[in-house]
């Protein structure tokens, strides 16, 4: 028999359902094994969320990140088997105040060439918890129909070991022109 939610008298069932769905989404994203929740899996979940609320999605993937001036996202994910990507969701009326939410979507963080010790790598599938929480929050905002223009941004990458990985000591230039030296 399916579970049944019992609410106190006077509770808003729609609000409770929105919270439960958001918490479940967040929990399921974080707990999904990395072989099923890489950048592509996160993009699929992102698209499903957008579809539920008739939101617009834009994805910048692979070398297009460089062409559109997202070099840091590209650098972190370029050594992985799945292309890095920037996921963007837009929802709400143009006349409403803009609310932007950004969630870190490092689907697995091996440490790249600064390889993490095994005991620290075990739970690195959860390094995309920021993205999962941002998506859960966006779900609640859209379910509530809040009078905002929502902009959700999730850089989805895997920080992998490979010939294309950035090295300790490399200096990368960000979208704003700020240089960043890679360290452990």
Task: Briefly describe each language-model feature range.
Residues 70-81, 131-145, 172-179:
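Charged, low-complexity, helix/coiled-coil-prone segments
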Residues 24-29, 97-101, 107, 111-124, ...:
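Glycine/charged-rich beta-loop-alpha catalytic/anionic-binding loops adjacent to active sites
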Residues 36-40, 131, 163:
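Short alpha-helix boundary/capping motifs
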Residues 46, 98-101, 110, 114-158:
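Alpha-helical metal-binding/catalytic segments enriched in His/Glu/Asp
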Residues 1-107, 143:
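N-terminal hydrophobic/helix-forming segments and targeting peptides
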Residues 85-88, 128-130, 178-182:
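Short, surface-exposed, polar/charged, turn-prone segments marking secondary-structure boundaries
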Residues 68-72, 111-119, 161-168:
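Short acidic, glycine/serine/threonine-rich loops at helix termini
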Residues 147-184:
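A glycine- and small/hydrophobic-rich beta-loop-beta segment
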């Amino acid at each position: 028999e399916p579970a049944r939610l019992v609410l106190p008298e006077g509770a808003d069932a729609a609000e409770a359902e929105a919270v439960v769905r958001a918490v479940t989404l967040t929990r399921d994203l974080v707990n999904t094994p990395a072989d099923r929740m890489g950048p592509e899996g996160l993009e699929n979940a992102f698209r499903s969320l957008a579809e539920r609320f008739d939101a617009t999605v834009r994805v910048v993937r692979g070398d297009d990140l460089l062409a559109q001036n997202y070099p840091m996202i590209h650098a972190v994910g370029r050594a992985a088997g799945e292309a890095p990507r920037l996921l963007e969701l837009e929802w709400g009326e143009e006349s409403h105040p803009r609310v932007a939410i950004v969630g870190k979507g490092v689907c697995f963080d091996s440490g790249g060439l600064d390889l993490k010790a095994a005991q620290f790598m075990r739970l690195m599938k959860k390094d995309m918890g920021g993205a999962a929480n941002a998506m859960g929050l966006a779900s609640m905002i859209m379910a509530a129909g809040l009078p905002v223009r929502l902009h959700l941004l999730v850089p989805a990458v895997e920080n992998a070991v490979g010939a294309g990985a950035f090295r300790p000591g490399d200096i990368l230039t960000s979208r704003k022109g700020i240089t960043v030296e890679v360290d452990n």
